[in-house]
Amino acid sequence: MKKEEKKENKKREQNQISSKKWNEWLAGLIDGAGKFTLSKSGYANLDILLELRDEKCHIELKQRFGGEIKRKETTLIRYRVHRLYGIRQLIACVNGHIRHPLRKIEFKEICMHYNVEYKEPETLTFANGWLSGYFDAVGLIEFSTEQDQLYLAFRHKKNTMLNELEIQKCLGVNLTCEQNGCSCESVTLYKINKKTVLSLYKYFKKYRLRSSIKTTQILLIPQFYEIQNETKEINDMQVKQKLWKQFFKKWYVDEMVKYESVKLANYYKSKTSPEKRVKKLIKLKFHRNERIRKRAERLELQKEKEKKA
């Protein structure tokens, strides 16, 4: 009996930890891409606007809180929850985790409306899943083959937002904005050193991202540094370019195929359910991966022929 009790206690602890991580991730996602509103008739709403390729995030939210998913533009989808049961559940999940100054004002108003005590968030650290949700919403990792440099990018209207949200303090570094064309369409690039990148890599392995392309890029970070070290010893520019080109295809594979905005947009016009659209998305990804695999096989055959010659 004691063994069974211990197992049950362990399961409960694991469930509590995983639910806490998920709540922190959700708060980060809302801070980056969400908005709380209170209508004149006294109904609370939460809207979260993401790119079409991140529809799986919305489906996960719909399964937990109800609500609806609608296409906003060609490449954007909106999740909305407004029913009382879903809103109350959501308040319980994110209370004590909301950090964005505007979201805090909106969320306080919602809490007051439903007579819920508002909780202030704790200091942001690497032992918190908030950053993964915020990164899913507005974060990017870019790289420059010319400088062999990785950049952290955020879609911010204000360059001071990293300080306001304590992200710099959490990372333990002072991020400096790139001067030459650093802001383009409200995307700001920040130079990051290898130590910070690898600590982010470890963090995102513990607090996983839900965005497919960002997850792919995070997993490719060690390979980036492998190629960086390899190209230092190579003098032939053509060989260097070839290595970076192959890596570039892996890094931006979803962008190059462009199945998200074009093919999935057509499915939104029909009355198919979100679950069916995700199945179609998986099929499209499978065909994409097959093309990549066949391309890799052709490259290997070419290399073998070159060696024999």
Curated annotation (Swiss-Prot):
**EC number(s) stated in the UniProt entry for this protein:** 3.1.-.-
> Which biological process, per GO, is one annotated for this protein?
intron homing
What is the top EC class of this enzyme, as a single word? Answer: hydrolase
A GO-annotated cellular component: mitochondrion
* Database matches in Gene3D superfamilies: Homing endonucleases (3.10.28.10)
Q: GO molecular function of the protein, one example?
A: DNA endonuclease activity
The subcellular location is: Mitochondrion
This protein's record includes keyword Mitochondrion: yes
* This protein's UniProt keywords: Endonuclease, Hydrolase, Intron homing, Mitochondrion, Nuclease
So what does this one do?
Answer: Mitochondrial DNA endonuclease involved in intron homing. Cleaves only one strand of intronless DNA sequence at the site which coincides with the I-SceII cleavage recognition site.
* Similarity comment: family membership: Belongs to the LAGLIDADG endonuclease family.
User: Extra notes?
Assistant: The expression of ai2a in E.coli causes growth inhibition and degradation of genomic DNA.
Alphabetized PANTHER family for the sequence: INTRON-ENCODED DNA ENDONUCLEASE AI2A-RELATED
Name-wise, this protein is Intron-encoded DNA endonuclease ai2a
What species is given as this protein's source? Dictyostelium discoideum
